[in-house]
């Protein structure tokens, strides 16, 4: 039996894209299969999605757009991604609910309410959080840390392009070694860029475990991690 009862999965927006599609339907279905595998273990799951496949606020500022406006555009991009994931969930008979850090009218999605979110998770629904913290100048990593704390998640599972945290960039350095586990203090001391400083500080303060792993190459990876297999890198106190 897994030690996890409720998890938060952090996905980048880029993970949804392919060479031909901003939002790739094959990838969406893979993500839903992964969600199903988590639910089949009687583990509750919430997701925080980025928007970098559409617009990234930090990138837009380089074009001359005001930083605050750029971040708002980036947050709207995450809402688009969340709706796409939720729609694919519903098509596959997975009950999903989108909750946004920005107030969006017209019945498009719900505003974030941590009490309602926890109640929905207990009923087996998947919560897809979007729009980060709802404020500019914060990353979706910080949004993930905040939402995980709000819903009382046991851990954040951060899906990345590589299968964990390494001593160096494994793409540039083939001799880089992967860490199986790290303490928060070790990660800070070694200056390992796991999350931005604000997100990492929140996780450390609230003793919120972080697992960094690669998800889409093998759709069983998250399920295997939840069963206790030593994959990726765990960061804890």
From Swiss-Prot:
A GO cellular component annotation in the UniProt record: cytosol
InterPro entries for this protein: AceGlu_kinase-like_sf, Asp/Glu/Uridylate_kinase, Uridylate_kinase, Uridylate_kinase_bac
Positions with a binding annotation for ATP: 10-13, 52, 56, 160, 166, 169
Keyword Nucleotide-binding in record: yes
GO BP annotations, alphabetical order: 'de novo' CTP biosynthetic process; UDP biosynthetic process
Domain of life: Bacteria
Activity control summary: Inhibited by UTP.
Keyword annotations of the record: ATP-binding, Cytoplasm, Kinase, Nucleotide-binding, Pyrimidine biosynthesis, Transferase
GO molecular function, one term: ATP binding
Chain sites annotated for binding UMP: 51, 71, 133-140
Assigned EC number: 2.7.4.22
Pathway: Pyrimidine metabolism; CTP biosynthesis via de novo pathway; UDP from UMP (UMPK route): step 1/1
Location, primary (coarse class): cytoplasm
Catalysis: reaction(s): UMP + ATP = UDP + ADP
Keyword Transferase in annotation: yes
Subcellular location: Cytoplasm
HAMAP family: PyrH_B
Function: Catalyzes the reversible phosphorylation of UMP to UDP.
PANTHER family, alphabetized: URIDYLATE KINASE (PTHR42833), URIDYLATE KINASE PUMPKIN, CHLOROPLASTIC (PTHR42833:SF4)
Family: Belongs to the UMP kinase family.
Subunit-level organization: Homohexamer.
Protein name in the entry: Uridylate kinase
């Amino acid at each position: 039996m897994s030690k996890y009862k409720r998890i938060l999965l952090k996905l980048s927006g880029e993970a949804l894209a392919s060479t031909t599609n901003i939002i790739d339907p094959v990838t969406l279905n893979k993500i839903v299969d992964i969600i199903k595998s988590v639910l089949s273990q009687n583990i509750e799951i919430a997701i925080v999605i980025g928007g970098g496949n559409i617009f990234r606020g930090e990138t837009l500022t380089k074009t001359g757009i005001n930083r605050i406006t750029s971040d708002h555009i980036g947050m709207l991009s995450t809402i688009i991604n969340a709706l796409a994931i939720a729609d694919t969930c519903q098509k596959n008979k997975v009950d999903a609910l989108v909750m946004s850090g920005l107030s969006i009218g017209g019945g498009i999605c719900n505003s974030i309410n941590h009490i309602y979110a926890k109640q929905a998770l207990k009923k087996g629904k998947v919560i897809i959080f979007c729009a980060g913290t709802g404020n500019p100048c914060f990353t979706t990593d910080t949004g993930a840390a905040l939402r995980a704390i709000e819903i009382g998640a046991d851990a954040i599972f951060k899906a990345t392009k590589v299968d964990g945290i390494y001593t160096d960039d494994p793409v540039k350095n083939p001799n880089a070694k992967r860490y199986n586990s790290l303490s928060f203090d070790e990660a800070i001391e070694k200056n390992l860029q796991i999350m931005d400083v604000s997100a990492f500080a929140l996780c450390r303060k609230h003793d919120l475990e972080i697992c960094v792993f690669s998800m889409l190459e093998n759709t069983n990876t998250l399920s295997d991690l939840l069963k206790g297999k030593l994959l990726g890198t765990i960061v804890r106190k």
